[in-house]
Amino acid sequence: MEMEEERKQDETWVQVAEGRWRRLTRRDFLKSAAAGAAAGSLGPLVLTERTRAQPVTLRILQWRHFVPPYDEWFNKVFAPKWGEKNGVRVVVENVGLAEIPAIAASEAARVAAGADPGHDMIQYLTPPATLERQVDTDAHREVIEELKRKVGPYIPLAEKSTYNPVTRRYFGVSDNFVPDPIHYRADLWRQVSARLTGDQRVPLLGPITWEDIRKAGRELKRMGHPVGLGLSQEIDTGMWLRALMYSWGTGEQDEAGNVILDVPPFRQRTLDALRFVKALYEETMFPGVFAWTAASNNEEFLAGRISIAANAISIARTAQAMAAAAIRRGENPNQSPAVQFARNTWITERAPRGPAGARGLEHVMGVYFIWRNRPRPVREAAKKLLIDLVLSYDPDVAAREGWPPGKFHASQAYDYPTFQNAISKQKRLAYLRDDPVAKAAGDRKDKLATIETAYEWAHNVGWPGPSSAAIDEVFNTWIINVMFARVAQGIDTPEQALDAAAAQIRRVFQKWREQGLVGGRR
């Protein structure tokens, strides 16, 4: 052990090309340097030991944020200023949300082959548990432990979304989750609420239950503004359908990782959920939901075509941005269509309630991971950036470090901290109850403050079990989405769709059990 430690101490990381490093002993390094000097006429020496004059390059891949000011802050303020302060050249590439899984899969294959992946760190938007063997689980653990020491607990939602209890390893670090309330047109909802009576009555101030959405949705569809909940092979569909399943008291697995959706008593609950979604589609929606993309919620709602969507607050924020632009153009807030639209774009206080409770998910789950084959200087830079990014939630910390306004304000409260005390509840609510974005739009200044309740109702993908490699594959191969869509379209009966999906899910779980990454027995 002592000899091994001495060997490691004698080694140094050497950059051999852009993004490529090699670990050499001091003796090997000096030999290479001498050889390069002897062949000086052949060109410059390639092997260069890292010095302060030659900063580490840290390559990050992440999504194009649905609140554009966040990318402006991260790319033009946080990353360059953090890099300057820490002697790191930070290169950020932003791509569409749907592009990330394919890029990550390609890079994972390169890591497995011992090659440079192309990026050093990637931000995923669902728990990337299938990549556990290609990522630096020790680095992730070190980041999480340091953040716990600095700011306190890592919320259970994040723990279940990044930690594998079977291997006892962290396959990622979650810096944020994005609450997923129901957005609805308050003006249209009030009209419907006034019209419905008796057992069809719905609350005046928006839906509380899934049945409220079904009842009101029938009228909203007749008015030309149907419900817009995707039934396609994309992330938002996967999230809201699981929220509904969990609210019906069923799901893919139990806490131990056993597949349960077709096992009594869960089988009947799953069938009931399938029948409900079929009725919800037929009575309240339109065929376009079968071609939904991650942008459709925003596009269809903001165009005025749909009246209800399950979405992060980016819908409300975009409506407010359009309203603020109208006010800057000189429009009267009390007459401006854009301002009125923003004022009538509301969110529910909680996830809709089903027979078993009000259980929601997150719209996206922000999880960063570092590839396992990154050299020590890059690894250390990635760890420090993640720690400082989480600490920047606090606007006072961000201002002191030189990258204001910080993560929470830059995202306009879209990114909610998984280290809950990175920004105190008092500071979160101070922002949300006197919201500068809402005020600039002529909107009610505290309208989005209810998003704080998401800590009480947001659940992880795969609840009540962990977000395992099997859950990751089931989610990203859209097995649940297809099951519900085939029933809604009348292609399969609920029983046929459930049996087919359960068989697929069991094969996925068995594959990952055989690799030692998933628990459970059936």
Question: Each predicted region: which residue ranges?
Answer:
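N-terminal secretory signal peptides
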Residues: 1-24, 28
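N-terminal export signals
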Residues: 20-22, 28-48
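Extracytoplasmic/periplasmic solute-binding protein
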Residues: 42, 47, 166-175, 180, ...
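Early extracytoplasmic/lumenal segment of secretory-pathway proteins
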Residues: 55-59, 64-128, 295, 299
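Hinge/lid segment of periplasmic solute-binding proteins
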Residues: 123-181, 240-244, 333-352, 520-522
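Short, solvent-exposed loop/beta-turn-alpha elements that line the ligand-binding surface or hinge
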Residues: 141-154, 203-206, 250-272, 332-341, ...
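Glycine-centered hinge/linker elements that transmit conformational signals in sensory
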Residues: 212-220, 256-294, 336, 345-347, ...
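C-terminal lobe and pocket-closing loops
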Residues: 314-325, 332-340, 355-479, 516-522
